[in-house]
Swiss-Prot record:
GO terms for cellular component: endoplasmic reticulum; endoplasmic reticulum membrane. Belongs to the steroid 5-alpha reductase family. It is found in: Microsome membrane; Endoplasmic reticulum membrane. It comes from Mus musculus. Signal peptide: none annotated. The keyword Mitochondrion does not apply. InterPro entries: 3-oxo-5-alpha-steroid_4-DH (IPR016636), 3-oxo-5_a-steroid_4-DH_C (IPR001104), SRD5A/TECR (IPR039357). This is 3-oxo-5-alpha-steroid 4-dehydrogenase 1. Its EC number is 1.3.1.22. GO terms for molecular function: 3-oxo-5-alpha-steroid 4-dehydrogenase (NADP+) activity; 3-oxo-5-alpha-steroid 4-dehydrogenase activity. The gene is Srd5a1.
Amino acid sequence: MELDELCLLDALVYLEGFLAFVAFVGLQMVGSSYGRYSSQWSGRRVPARPAWFLQELPSMAWPLYECIRPAAARLGNLPNRVLLAMFLIHYVQRTLVFPVLIRGGKPTLLFTFVLAFLFCTLNGYLQSRYLSQFAVYAEDWVTHPCFLTGFALWLVGMVINIHSDHILRNLRKPGETGYKIPRGGLFEYVSSANYFGELVEWCGFALASWSLQGVVFALFTLCALFTRARQHHQWYLEKFEDYPKTRKILIPFLL
C-alpha cells in the first residue's frame, strides 16, 4: 500500500511539472483572468473573499489532517515536523488571514477559482503526504547549511510577501477609486514585490526540504507568477507615464 502511494506521489511530481509548463504557456497566450484583468473575461464569478478562502483551504487542510493522524509515520522526526509546519503556516495565512484583509477585491471567475482549488488540493496532498509519510531526514538536518539557508529564505520571502500585500491594500485612501503606483519596500525595485516574496519563500522551502516535491512546487510558482508579473509590469508601463522605468518585472536588478 505504501509503495503504491509512493508511486502515486512520484507521478504527481511529474504531473505538477507538466502543469508548470502548461501554466507558463497558457498564461503567456491568454493572460491572467483575475483582479484588474477579470473584466476582460465573461463567465460566472465567485466573490473575492470566499474564493480565496475556499481555493486555498485544501493546502491548509491536508497538513492539518496529517498532524492529527496517528499513522503519520515520519512526523516523529523534527525535520519533517518543521518542514510541514512551514508549508502549513503559509496556508494558514493565505486561507484565514489574507481573505479577511481584502479590500474591495474583484470577483474571481468560477473557472479560475476551480483551477486554483484543484491545484491546492493536488499540491497540498503531495507536499503533506510526502513529508508525513515518506521523507527521510537525519535528525540533525535542521542544522545543515542547506536547511538553514532554505529556512531563512522561506522566512524572508514570507515577510516580503505579507509586507508587499499590505502596501497594495493601502494604496487607496478611504473613498478613493482607481489604481496607483505601488511605492515602498521592494516595489521600488520590481513591479510585483508580492510575487517575488512568494517565489523566494517556496525556493527556500525547496532548498530546506531538499526534495523533488519541493522543487517542482517552486518551479510551478515561478512559471505561474512570472507570466502574471510580466503582465502587471506591462500594464503599469501603459497605464502610468511616470512609472519608474528602472523597475524590473519580478527579480530585483535582474528580471
